[in-house]
Swiss-Prot record:
The lineage of its organism: Eukaryota, Metazoa, Chordata, Craniata, Vertebrata. This is Proprotein convertase subtilisin/kexin type 7. InterPro entries: Galactose-bd-like_sf, Kexin/furin, P_dom, Peptidase_S8/S53_dom, Peptidase_S8/S53_dom_sf, Peptidase_S8_His-AS, Peptidase_S8_Ser-AS, Peptidase_S8_subtilisin-rel. Residues 195-228, 761-783 are annotated as: Disordered. Glycans are attached at N166, N174, N240, N510.
Length: 783
């Protein structure tokens, strides 16, 4: 064999392959560990029981500062019998020294600890050092001792994770609705129930049915006046009291306005919508017109005015938040566009989905629905667990709350969480945040369409399912939208026939740039159409509105049970499906008769288009969408981050004040006391004057002058004629005619009325009293 060459073993030799495999495996496992020691991530490769020290070295000067520090750290670690595991995170000059492998015995470890401590304590390059100990940390989670909380799947669904409102993470960050008051406008709230009593707000409550401050529900024959109490429990039921359940905003205050347990008028509704509107922030209204599939109704003139006034003046000018349920007429083919409360631009219209995310049998659909949240569904699915009244057959807790009546309070509670982190959200800010953060939920019945601005909407689910985490994180960084801009078209006279399907009537209106210049309206929020249509069967009409982008809204759905022969008289339909789209362009209203009966043809008499929106441009909307998505990690959801809030307006609580019975009783008592004191004072004055007159009577022919009644003298009224002195009282004075001297005869003519002066002269004449000179008088006296 030539010198200098060695025999290399072949890979297929008997032991060659196993050796190579072992080497490769060793490299695979050991290299990452060795490399990991040079990074902060290498700390995870150390045994839990290994020794380690955090060491802060004195900083060095020079261009190669970092390299010098690493060399110094290696030297110090070696001197201490340790290994430099690398810099700790991004902290300059901070390094982790760890125990070398192979010193796992207790005695060896203790000896190494003492050696390391001695070296590090005396080394001149070490500024600070600390042996690392295992720290005990626990994930922050919410635990309640309320017995029914595990059954509140809508708050924390353990059976089907993700099918809930995603609120526990918000609670963990101490966002519970603190500082916010929600009022339930309903049939009363039993505020003495232990789940509600600690959070009850008497200042925000009132009973409009009995006209007193206490909204306590009254027992009824049907045992049905528990509705408001159940809704209140959903919002603010107190946690950790070992009773029933927990509210979604359990740190908020809850008030009640009792108005549905008796006759209801337009004026009562108006009072309810604005009652204590500087105390109450959110009005939860789980009621509306009959859900019978044939009613077209809503707030009347005063109710509409109160809603508008509430969003303008309520909550110190930021606007009251009105949350309304979309309705439970689904089994009657009803539609919430025929409900004026759900149709209003001033309300947050909330629908329902069941535990599986499907539209329940009772739920209504409409183009004005903003969002949905959870409620009960079919009998096989769970309903909402909440507080109940304990009157009559109630136990204080129920597992059977359902309907959109149960969905609206959940939305109100989530809005309370939003207002805690951002109290200055306006009523339109709340609507915008819902639109921007609601999540699309799969349902085969949902007709999801994405509009020009990128928002997806369905007539069944609105913009989607409310998510408390997304709502609160968005609210935390939200800056207010621009002012509300609007455009109203002229009243468009048509008088055109409505043909039967498949034909249709189509009318157009073009909104130009010039039309929008004055208001500055650029992008849409709500679009409203007011129509007057005659038709022998109202339920056979179908109305669709197309925005300039082509987005279709079914604003008037056919209803099989609506046989009203009067059609529509200035009824306003609205849609939110064009939210964020450009306002300028051609709007198309398409109407057709889908009935199968040979009836008289309907007539579109007139219609009017109203646009609501803001000066935001499409680019502004895109930027806001991006900003909100960046906040969904929760990085801003802490107390150290707060955007400044503008001060609210100082608005009086109410223009008028309803006098309560207790106040009236107090006023009556005060009035009676005032009358008594007045009479007493008058008697006292009268008696004192008589006593004075008897004490200071005519002495030596002289009497006090002038008389006590100065008012009579000043205004020139006649004084009653009365003798000033008798002949017996005069001392050294001619008294021949003294008994006929009267006050009226002694007064100057200018102090008497004409009749009194004549009377004075006549009485002198009748008595034939000759004039005589008065005696010498002291000042202020006559005789």
């Amino acid at each position: 064999m030539p010198k200098g060459r060695q025999k290399v073993p072949r890979l297929d030799a008997r032991l060659g392959l196993p050796i190579c495999l072992c080497l490769e495996l060793a490299i695979f496992f050991l290299v990452p560990q060795v490399m990991g020691l040079t990074e902060a991530g290498g700390l995870d490769t150390l045994g839990a029981g290994g020794l380690s020290w955090a060491v802060h070295l004195d900083s060095l000067e020079g261009e190669r500062k970092e390299e010098s520090l690493i060399q110094q750290a290696n030297a110090v670690a070696q001197a201490a019998g340790l290994v430099n595991a690398g810099r700790i995170g991004e902290l300059q000059g901070h390094y982790l020294f760890v125990q070398p492998a192979g010193h796992g015995q207790a005695m060896e470890a203790e000896a190494m600890r003492q050696q390391a401590e001695a070296v590090l304590a005396k080394h001149e390059a070490v500024r600070w050092h600390s042996e690392q100990r295992l720290l005990k940390r626990a994930k922050r989670s919410i635990h309640f001792n309320d017995p029914k909380y595990p059954q509140q799947w809508h708050l924390n669904n353990r059976r089907s994770p993700g099918r809930d409102i995603n609120v526990t993470g918000v609670w963990e960050r101490n966002v519970t609705g603190r500082g916010v008051t929600v009022v339930v406008v309903d049939d009363g709230v039993e505020h003495t129930v232990q789940d509600i009593a600690p959070n009850y707000s008497p200042e925000g409550s009132y009973d409009l049915n009995s006209n007193d401050p206490d909204p306590m529900p009254h027992p009824d024959e049907e045992n049905g006046n528990h509705h408001g109490t159940r809704c209140a429990g959903e919002i603010a039921a107190v946690p950790n009291n070992s009773f029933c359940a927990v509210g979604v905003a359990y740190g908020s205050r809850i008030a009640g306005i009792r108005v549905l347990d008796g006759p209801l008028t337009d004026s009562m509704e108006a009072v309810a919508f604005n009652k204590h509107y500087q105390i109450n922030d959110i009005y939860s209204c789980s009621w509306g017109p009959d859900d019978d599939g044939k009613t077209v109704d809503g707030p009347h003139q005063l109710g509409k005015a109160a809603l508008q006034h509430g969003v303008m003046a309520g909550r110190q000018g930021f606007g009251s938040i009105f949350v309304v349920a979309s309705g439970n007429g689904g089994q009657h083919n009803d539609n919430c566009n025929y409900d004026g409360y759900a149709n209003s631009i001033y309300t947050v219209t909330i629908g329902a989905v069941d535990e599986e995310g499907r539209m329940p049998f009772y739920a209504e659909e409409c183009a004005s629905m903003l969002a949905v949240t959870f409620s009960g569904g079919d009998k096989m699915l769970r309903s909402i667990v909440t507080t109940d009244w304990d009157l009559q057959k109630g136990t204080g807790c129920t597992e059977g709350h359902t309907g959109t009546s149960a969905a609206a309070p959940l939305a109100a509670g989530m809005i309370a969480l939003m207002l805690q982190v951002r109290p200055c959200l306006t009523w339109r800010d709340v609507q915008h945040i819902i639109v921007f953060t609601a999540t699309q939920y799969e349902d085969h019945r949902a007709d999801w369409l994405t509009n020009e601005a990128g928002f997806s909407h369905s007539h069944q689910h609105g913009f989607g399912l409310l998510n408390a985490w997304r709502l609160v994180n968005a609210a935390k960084i939200w800056t207010s939208v621009p002012y509300l801009a609007s455009y109203v078209s002229p009243m468009l006279k048509e008088n055109k026939a409505v043909p039967r399907s498949p034909h249709s009537l189509e009318v157009l209106w073009n909104v130009s740039r010039t039309d929008l210049e004055m208001s500055g309206l650029k992008t849409l929020e709500h679009v409203a159409v007011t129509v007057s249509i005659t038709h022998p069967r109202r339920g056979s009409l179908e109305l669709k509105l197309f925005c300039p982008s082509g987005m279709m809204s079914l604003i008037g759905a056919p209803r099989s049970m609506d046989s009203d022969p009067n059609g529509f008289n200035d009824w306003t339909f609205s849609t939110v499906r064009c939210w964020g789209e450009r306002a300028r362009g051609v709007y198309r209203l398409v109407i057709r008769d889908v009935g199968d009966e040979p009836l008289q043809v309907g007539i579109l008499q007139q219609w009017q288009l109203t646009l609501y929106g803001s000066t935001w441009s499409p680019v502004d909307i895109k930027d806001r969408q991006s900003l909100l998505e960046s906040a969904m990690s929760g990085k801003y959801l802490h107390d150290d981050f707060t955007l400044p809030c503008p001060p609210g307006l100082k608005i009086p609580e109410e223009d008028g004040y309803s006098i309560t019975p207790n106040t009236l009783k107090t006023l009556v008592l005060v009035g009676c006391f005032s009358v008594f004191w007045t009479i007493y004072y008058m008697l006292e004055v009268c008696l004192s004057q008589r006593s004075k007159a008897s004490t200071h009577g005519c002495r030596r022919g002289c009497c006090p002058w002038p008389p006590q009644s100065q008012n009579s003298k000043e205004v020139g009224t006649a004084l009653e004629s009365m003798p000033l002195c008798s002949s017996k009282d005069l001392d050294g004075v001619d008294s021949e005619h003294g008994d006929c001297t009267t006050a009226s005869s002694l007064l100057a003519p200018e102090l008497l009325g004409e009749a009194d002066w004549s009377l004075s002269q006549n009485s002198k004449s009748d008595l034939d009293c000759p004039p005589h000179q008065p005696p010498d008088l002291k000042d202020g006296q006559i005789c």
